[in-house]
């Protein structure tokens, strides 16, 4: 059985539980995906399947050959598989392979925030608002010492580009599936904004 699926983030909403509490949920349009390649231990050194998702506007000859006539896919991703012998090129993967209450890991690209200061990027407290301060309210403070070490240590938290990173959130719960509309309703938040490509894998797979 294939342990993942590719989808697109639709957005967030909320549902009300039996006790009346509101539960934030994320809607993901997952699949249908097509198996475009099966990788085996003998030929590739490991077992996995490559899935294709979405229709591409433009596609190179190399990718077209890789898709093997099953379509011009916008996204290609590899996922694990339990029984490689049961999977064939051309098989379709849909949300019906997931069950309500099942735990998943969701991977995507977080929303880009551009160039951000240390208060927004790293949650620094900033300087005091009074006692003679005029332009130090959101400043980083000291970033290193003097002659020794004479440099800034690697990994020092400073202002810079924020967001647009690959992020994986683990142990999310599938609350509901809709096979007709290819929808997964996932408890909580998933990385990225609307229309972000999301790779969903079953937790621990």
Curated annotation (Swiss-Prot):
GO CC annotations on file: cytosolic large ribosomal subunit
GO terms under biological process: translation
Gene Ontology terms, MF aspect: rRNA binding; structural constituent of ribosome
Positions of the UniProt region annotated as Disordered: 126-150
Keyword check for Cell membrane: no
Domain of life: Bacteria
Alphabetically ordered keywords of this record: Ribonucleoprotein, Ribosomal protein, RNA-binding, rRNA-binding
Entry's family note: Belongs to the universal ribosomal protein uL3 family.
Job of this protein: One of the primary rRNA binding proteins, it binds directly near the 3'-end of the 23S rRNA, where it nucleates assembly of the 50S subunit.
Subunit description: Part of the 50S ribosomal subunit. Forms a cluster with proteins L14 and L19.
Entry protein name: Large ribosomal subunit protein uL3
């Amino acid at each position: 059985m294939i342990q993942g699926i590719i989808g697109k983030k639709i957005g967030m909403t909320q549902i009300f539980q039996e006790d009346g509490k509101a539960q934030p949920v994320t809607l993901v349009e997952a699949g249908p995906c097509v198996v475009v390649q099966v990788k085996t231990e003998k030929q590739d050194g490991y077992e996995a399947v490559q899935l294709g998702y979405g229709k591409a506007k433009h596609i190179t000859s190399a990718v077209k050959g890789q898709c093997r006539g099953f379509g011009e896919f916008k996204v290609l991703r590899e996922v694990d598989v339990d029984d490689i012998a049961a999977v064939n090129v051309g098989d379709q993967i849909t949300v019906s392979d997931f069950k309500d209450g099942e735990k998943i890991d969701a991977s995507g690209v977080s929303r880009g925030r551009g160039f951000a200061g240390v208060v927004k990027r790293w949650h620094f407290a900033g300087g005091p608002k009074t006692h003679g301060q005029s332009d130090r309210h959101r400043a980083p403070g000291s970033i290193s010492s003097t002659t020794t070490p004479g440099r800034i240590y690697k990994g020092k938290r400073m202002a810079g580009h924020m967001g647009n990173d690959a992020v994986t959130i683990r142990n999310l719960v599938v609350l509901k599936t809709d096979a007709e509309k290819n929808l997964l309703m996932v408890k909580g938040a998933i990385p990225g904004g609307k229309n972000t490509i999301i790779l969903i894998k079953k937790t621990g797979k």
